[in-house]
Design a protein with these regions (language model features):
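Short, Lys/Arg- and Gly-enriched loop/turn segments at beta-strand edges
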Residues: 56-61
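A generic structural signal for residues embedded in beta-strands
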Residues: 49-50, 135
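Amphipathic alpha-helical coiled-coil/heptad-repeat segments
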Residues: 119-170
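A short glycine-rich beta-alpha junction/loop motif
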Residues: 51, 65-72, 100-124
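Sequence-specific dsDNA recognition surfaces
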Residues: 1, 10, 14-44, 62, ...
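Short peripheral tails and domain-boundary helices/loops at the edges of structured domains
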Residues: 68-86, 167
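Active-site/binding-pocket entry motifs
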Residues: 17-18, 54-55, 94
Length: 170
């Protein structure tokens, strides 16, 4: 048996990545000891990117997990991880266009290996860039929540006003 709901080691699936914004905090499946032994283990805190189906989507793992060949791991890099995450996010639309179609979209690892990116030499600058972009992500998330709440309020107002439950004095 490959799966074990009581295991603390997750099995990363494309659907887990698709619903994750930046940090993956859980997976829908967990692996048994046998599953772990026959998979590639990725400890928490690693940068992972999907290369099949939903290609080019990066995440940072907040849990221990195992991956299949539909993912690549970026570890041992001499770059601040959050900075590299944002570089990959910037490349995501381009890689989506360059994915090879078959039964499902795939991204050639050679394309990843040969992609050149500009990385500031200063880790302080890398951190500053990543912090600015992370702060902007937080602002966007807050605005999206506010927009969602405003839409719900409008929907309620439409229900009240357009059905005659609430009358306006004019």
């Amino acid at each position: 048996i490959w799966f074990d709901r009581t295991s603390s080691v997750g099995w990363l699936r494309i659907s887990d990545v698709s619903k994750t914004v930046k940090y993956l905090t859980e997976t829908t499946q967990s692996l048994s000891e046998l599953g772990i032994a026959n998979s590639r283990f990725v400890p928490q805190g690693n940068l992972v990117m999907s290369i099949c189906a939903t290609v080019g989507k990066p995440i940072i793992t907040s849990v221990n997990l195992c991956i299949h060949d539909g993912f690549v791991v970026f570890n041992g890099l001499s770059v601040i991880q959050d900075h590299m995450y944002y570089i990959l996010k910037k490349l995501e639309p381009e890689w989506s266009k360059q994915g090879q179609t078959g039964s499902q979209m795939n991204l050639n690892t050679e394309l990843i290996n040969t992609t050149l990116v500009l990385i500031p030499q200063s880790q302080a600058e890398q951190t500053a860039i990543a912090t600015i972009l992370s702060d902007m992500d937080t602002d966007i998330s807050s605005l999206q929540q506010q927009l969602s709440k405003t839409r719900q309020i409008k929907q309620g107002m439409m229900q009240e006003l357009l059905t005659g439950k609430t009358r306006l004095k004019v």
